[in-house]
Regions:
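Active-site hotspot residues in diverse enzymes, especially metal/ion-binding acidic/histidine motifs
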Residues: 1-209
Length: 209
């Protein structure tokens, strides 16, 4: 059974089934470690964060290589109308794990937050068989994954100090703080915008899928 993160009225079950099948086919030939290693995945968090500093056309290849070492077949896939999916995680019959993501909104900061959100689901054991991560619908499982993803990207205590000092009022300070967290400045900007601390403005997008 799949765990849902969406309003089901937006989901076409036939489209969703086709999309899931596409994920399975696109990850079928990816060479991965014999078994899922969640401890190694946790250890690789700093390496995964470093990937955001690479050129956009190199990111998917590098992420695929990192996840492969952890026994996870990773792929960024196109999204379909009728399947408002952010991520799909499935344990295969041979014990491997598939992790697919879409670029529905294409914003770079949302991509990285969603990626770490999916990683949190893996580390939290939310993927016993199959987990479909849609765009909406909340709950304890989702809140926990959101919190963990946010912490992976930006230390919450240091972020609170940064906000309290009003460093967000200067772009140079945003860049400086981002460097202390080993993330791109758009990660900090995205969080500040989401929390309505700064106004919404243009930010980088990806165009892979």
């Amino acid at each position: 059974a799949a765990a849902y993160r969406a309003q089901n009225k937006n989901v076409d079950p036939y489209v969703l089934f086709a999309w899931q099948r596409m994920c399975e086919l696109l990850t079928k030939n990816i060479e991965i470690a014999d078994e899922v290693d969640t401890e190694k995945l946790r250890e690789m968090i700093p390496d995964i964060k470093q990937v955001m500093f690479m050129r956009a056309n190199q990111i998917q290849k590098k992420l695929t290589a990192i996840f492969s070492e952890c026994g996870i077949a990773f792929r960024i896939v196109p999204n379909f109308t009728g399947a408002p999916v952010q991520g799909f995680i499935k344990k295969t019959e041979d014990g491997a794990l598939i992790l697919c993501m879409t670029l529905r909104q294409k914003f770079a900061d949302i991509f990285w937050f969603t990626l770490f959100h999916e990683i949190a689901h893996v580390l939290n054991g939310d993927t016993k068989h199959e987990f479909i991560d849609f765009d909406s619908v909340s709950g304890e499982v989702e809140s926990k994954a959101d919190s963990m993803a946010g912490e992976f990207l930006i230390d919450s205590k240091e972020y609170k100090r940064f906000v309290a000092a009003e460093g967000y009022k200067r772009s140079s300070e945003i860049e400086r703080f981002a460097s202390t967290q080993n993330v791109k400045d758009y990660i900090v900007q995205g969080r500040l915008m989401k929390e309505k601390i700064i106004p919404w403005k243009a930010r980088p997008r990806y165009e892979w899928a």
